[in-house]
A protein has these predicted regions:
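Conserved alpha-helix/loop element of class I SAM-dependent methyltransferases that forms part
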Residues: 26-45
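N-terminal, positively charged/glycine-rich alpha-helical extensions of SAM-dependent methyltransferases
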Residues: 1-16
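Conserved beta-strand signature within the Rossmann-like core of class I S-adenosyl-L-methionine
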Residues: 142-150
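Core SAM-dependent methyltransferase catalytic element
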Residues: 185-198
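Class I SAM-dependent methyltransferase SAM/SAH-binding core
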Residues: 46-105
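A short glycine-rich, Lys/Arg-flanked "PGG" loop and its adjoining helix->strand segment in the class I
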Residues: 129-141
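A short acidic, Gly/Pro-enriched loop at the edge of an enzyme's catalytic core
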Residues: 104-115
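A short SAM/SAH-binding and catalytic strip from SAM-dependent methyltransferases
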Residues: 115-127
Length: 198
């Protein structure tokens, strides 16, 4: 039962998935706000979120991009439904587009977005390197990616550091430049955010 519940965070389904969406909306608020601040979003930016969950960050980014466009992709039909309800007006106006799908391949053309981000979803990607390659493909030259992970499985700060170093390595491996890492103390354990430029 516990394994089934935990698996819902990777791919929320059914009534348990709807409950998980409520939890994610509460738990990810601070991580979302921090990630969005690192992105330095401009009013005309084209922004993509991978693994948008209940759609809170999509909603916030839409407010920051009155002359731009916001897209999101998530594996879970339950999360797509919740996020679509939360962002209904922006979807109707064409400002926001939400789709069900995986991080690889991304259903967008090359050089589409100025900013791409993921909050607590990369750890569930089936192939992180392929996913990051896709992120780089859809980013415009000079575009920015921010990947935020709070490794809840880590028992020590040393384990968090391993996650951070791996994230930096992966960003560099697929060709991102000016890769840097930021950390933030968000209970119960340190959150890491890796940023790179195409």
């Amino acid at each position: 039962m516990i394994e089934r519940f935990n698996s819902q965070f990777a791919h929320p389904e059914g009534w348990v998935g709807r409950f998980v969406g409520t939890i994610l909306a509460l738990k990810n608020r601070e991580r979302n706000a921090w990630t969005i601040s690192i992105l330095n979003i401009q009013p005309d930016d084209q922004v993509l979120e991978i693994g948008f969950g209940p759609g809170q960050a999509i909603q916030e980014v839409a407010k920051l991009t009155p002359n731009g466009f916001v897209a999101g992709i998530d594996l879970s039909d339950v999360m797509v439904a919740q996020a679509s309800k939360r962002n209904a007006a922006a979807i109707r106006s064409g400002h926001v587009l939400l789709q069900q799908g995986a991080e690889s391949p991304l259903p967008f053309e090359d050089n589409k977005f100025n900013k791409v981000f993921a909050v607590n979803s990369m750890q569930f990607w089936s192939n992180p390197i392929a996913g990051l390659q896709e992120v780089r493909r859809v980013l415009k030259p000079g575009g920015r990616v921010v990947i935020t992970i709070q490794p809840m499985w880590a028992k020590t700060e040393e384990e968090v550091q391993i996650v951070a170093e791996k994230l930096v390595f992966q960003l560099k491996q697929v060709g991102f430049k000016q890769v840097r890492l930021e950390t933030r103390q968000i209970k119960p354990i340190t959150t890491v955010s890796g940023m790179g430029i195409k």
